[in-house]
């Protein structure tokens, strides 16, 4: 950026005249003053005050004497002073002129190098200002990109996701309630089915008992019919016997009538037989009526019992058919409820799978958006750091430029001072004793205080202290 040269080979005229300047060095390729960088680039930081003390030693003669600046060497160069009316020492003037020309040549070279360095600094400052403007435009562009829009989109998407999650949660809760209701209905139907099965078993048991009663009644009826037949046979037999007896009695009566006719003194047997017949007929009629009444009562009882059993059997069969129809309807309803439950469970699993996939997709979108936001924040922070670093560099360069400007102004004033002194010099011849007595050294200490705040020069103060040696 600037040409480097060794400080041991070249010594600045400023150093040779004013001594070492505190805080900076002109011998380095990029001679920049050493400033504390703390506080630059930080908004609201405390102001920093930089003080520089320049020691200027000037050798002044008597009235109208030649004043030369003090060199940084151990010895002090004392220029001879010429009084009025004395002879001019041309060899000394020639030496002074040669030294002045050499000094001017070195100063010209150093000023050219300083100009080159300042040109490079100006180019660098211009380049940094361009970069600073580009970064400022980039920062403004990033600020104008509406970062809140991303937050709004994020919040809107989050609200939509929350709404969908709430809808799915409500649907799942409703499906759970329906499933619980179906499970309760299924349990109730199962309990009712068990009750109906128990009732059917009781009806079947009653039917079996009724069947046993019917069988017993049938057997009793058959027995009674058999007994009726036997009684009818017995009645027929008794009738036959009775008829035989009647015939026998009639035959006997006829024989007795014959004997009566033969013997009128014998008792009347016809009346006795008639009485006996009447008695037997009465007894037979009574037995027949009693047998018929008993048979009729037994037949009516058996008929009533059979009718009751038939009614009970018919009612049991009807109830069994109703129970069978109810069982079939309940079985169909249970199958339908099982199918509905299976479809609801399948829908619930599908909803859960879809909800899980959508939730994972939303989580991926959220992670991607958060990663983009983090990336944008990191990029913005990086641009801000670069902008801050460039701003710090610019402030430091502004301070260095201001310092070099002050140094150049001081150097120009120092260069112009010997020319004016040399032009106003009255050459006169003096003796070495007079020159030695008139030469005295005047030391000037310049204290310059520069106060900067946030990289800008706020105030400057310069104090000079004169000391005669």
Swiss-Prot record:
GO BP terms, alphabetized: intermediate filament organization; nuclear envelope organization; skeletal muscle organ development
Region (Coil 2A): 268-286
Pfam families hit by this protein: Filament, Filament_head
Sites of Omega-N-methylarginine modification: 16, 37, 70
Statement: the UniProt record of this protein carries the keyword Coiled coil: yes
Positions of modified residues (ADP-ribosylarginine): 58
GO MF: cytoskeletal protein binding; identical protein binding; structural constituent of cytoskeleton
Name of the protein in question: Desmin
Keywords: ADP-ribosylation, Cell membrane, Coiled coil, Cytoplasm, Intermediate filament, Membrane, Methylation, Muscle protein, Nucleus, Phosphoprotein, Ubl conjugation
Organism: Rattus norvegicus (Rat)
Region (Tail) residue spans: 412-469
Region (Linker 12): 252-267
Ranges of residues in domain IF rod: 107-415
Gene Ontology CC entries for this record: cardiac myofibril; cell tip; cell-cell junction; contractile muscle fiber; cytoplasm; cytoskeleton; fascia adherens; gap junction
